[in-house]
Amino acid sequence: TRDISPYGKEWCTKTVSALASAQEKPLIVSGLALGTDICAHKTALESGLPTIGVMATGPETVYPFRHRDFAERLWRTPGCALISDYPPGTAPLALHFLRRNRIIAGICDTTVLIESKIKGGGMMTSRLAFSYSRDVYALPGRIDDIRSQGCNRLIREKVAEPLTSVEDLLDSLGLNSRVTARKICTRDI
C-alpha cells in the first residue's frame, strides 16, 4: 500500500532486516512506490541487501518524483538496480503500474505482501505470483483496517500463507540457521 500504517511499516522493516541476517542474502524487489515499496527498498539498503526497483515509466523518469534521489542512490549501489520494461519518454500511466507488477511477480521466488486494500496493486502482484507457482505470504491485520483487508482475503482464499513471525518466514525460505536441509532457489538477473 502507498498509505502504510505504523503496523505495516514496523513489520516491513522487521521482515527485511531479518532477511538481512540470513547467511544467503536474498534480493529485495519492489516498485519504488510510496509506502511499503520505499520502506522495503530503504531497509534493504540500510541492511546491506541488494534491491531492485521495478519502474512503471521510462528509465529516465522516477515516479513518484520525490523518490528521485533515493532511486539514484539505489542505482549507484553495487548489487542493486533499476529496471524498466518501457522505453525512454514513457509517462507514469495507471496501466503501466499493473504491467510492472507482472515483472515483480516474475522476478521473485517469494512475494511478501505487508498491507493492501482489496483492490491494491499488491493484490495483483500476489495473485500473479501465486499463478506462477511462487510462494506468497501476507501479513494478517485488523479486520476493520482497510489496509489489511487485501492481506486477510489472500490468507482466507489460501493464495497466501500468513506471515506470523519473521522466524517462520526465514525457516520457510530455508534462510534460518536452524534449517539445514532445504533447497534454495535463486535467480540471476
Name these PLM-found stretches.
Residues 1-189:
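Glycine-biased, small-residue-rich flexible motifs in mid-sequence functional cores and linkers
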